[in-house]
């Protein structure tokens, strides 16, 4: 597949918002693959996260005050809180899909023979494509993400 574009960015801890990338598809396409990758979904191991920093985060974000003997609650926070990023796309201002499975790499694939879960097959793969990164929670500073769009041009 031909790479139409690839963008990369870093998200700060606590960021909530949307980032939209818009591009005109250069030709009618037979296949479209929109991919998003990110990392730092969960806190690293307990020995890499300062205890006071984790307690402060739990109090600030969730209103939970953790004492010295709250090992179970701290373990729960450490292993269950996550960075949550979804991916949505429109083609010619019509919704064609949104994926939010908790994977570090996600693909939205559109073709005559293949369609990703959470997507709607458009009548035609041509026109203005908008890809929106929907960010609901970022745990750690400098969380990297990457969005790429690959196409197969329709043969004439």
Which residues fall in each region the model found?
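Acidic, Ser/Thr/Pro
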Residues: 1-156
